[in-house]
């Protein structure tokens, strides 16, 4: 007989019981197995563009697409999704046109975006059974574009980590190997997308939480400048802080999904939905101009703190060689100011002495996961005056980095640098609870620069024997070296994905997406 659970464990057990009961309703989805019965059934339609085309022509029904996606999902808005799909199919039958550019596209959300009638737990037991009364601005906008909200996905306790684990829902695993992480904090999304169980996912990024999972799972992930997309109705730990704002961003298995989703949302004028959004329209002229000429690309191989593993460096060298061969100009970038930006970010994380997260965990009574325990045990809160000095230093660093970027020019044509490319992390996916250093992504949150991750390669057998002998710079560098030595054979056997990160100036989101398309096309053609 199962032992009766009490306190936070009873709450978690009840949530999972409800979840599993709802899943069982769809455990055996209706599929058309008769050969030739429907050649356009959605099975195998992985590309975002192919799916939108078939839906817009009426070759697929929204209901069929949703039912097929449900077969692989674990979070539960299924009844609502089927109902919405039927509404969209009826609209198409009556009007012979789609509702919008995301008509019928199944969408999943990190368990942070409010959906009326459903919890937004953000990994806390104390937020369970407290459903939102209103959709978040993003959900309102996605629905108006024709998207179908399918599910909400797992994230770490407090959100503030690059792996995905909490006492309420448990540990999210990598579909390639259950002993490895899919990244975080948007790890539920990356695991679903990599499994083929979602078409378009949405997460948030305050230190790499969209880009790291994309890198680890071979996906596309975009962190826009923070004020481009609406944060209204998206609860978060340390809510109210403005020193390093979090960004909302998409993940997908294709870049056209990222581009279409972001552009379509901007064209809905997010500033009419959220007072914090900048009134910057979609600038097609910037996108087209960037797309049609040779790019000046800065490249940074090493942030000076933690050396990347051999496959990370090899893949970036491959990208640089391919881009140079395609006629683009490469400029050596440096890591000046990066370490100080990361150190400042770490201080910002701790300004309240861990009070916000401590109180949220206390409300549910669950234990802290190890990383969160360390975060809340970070010391005492600082004074308002001390906090102001940190913000002053942030502005100084942002100005210094702007001047650094302005000073970097291509020696051949004196053009400024369009984008910088660099690793998203020092390693690929790793065994659970092994991540330590996120400086390769975090720096761009301090600066609030847009950053895109694209898949660029995989760990392979030749990486195992690569020369990688050096004296460690610090304890983090030593940890990273041991991680490679201990895991390289498994990483190679799994052919773990490796991404490349593409960064642009603040608010140059259209230029980053355009450069991303150019770079992605070059890499695909050179593979």
Language-model segments: residues:
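An N-terminal boundary/leader segment
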Residues: 1-90, 325-327, 477-479, 491-492, ...
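Acidic-enriched catalytic cores of C-N bond-cleaving enzymes acting on peptides and small amides
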Residues: 1-34, 38, 253-281, 288-290, ...
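Short glycine/serine-rich loop/turn segments
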Residues: 101-248, 300-302, 351, 420-435, ...
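Classical protein tyrosine phosphatase
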Residues: 59, 63-68, 141, 317-322, ...
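Serine-dependent amide/ester hydrolase catalytic core
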Residues: 49-56, 301, 308, 337, ...
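Short glycine/threonine-rich loop-to-helix capping motif typified by GTGT followed
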Residues: 312, 341-352, 430-436
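N-terminal, positively charged, Ser/Thr/Ala/Gly-biased leader segments
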Residues: 59, 63, 70-127
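Structural helix-boundary/capping segments
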Residues: 140, 144, 194-300, 317-326, ...
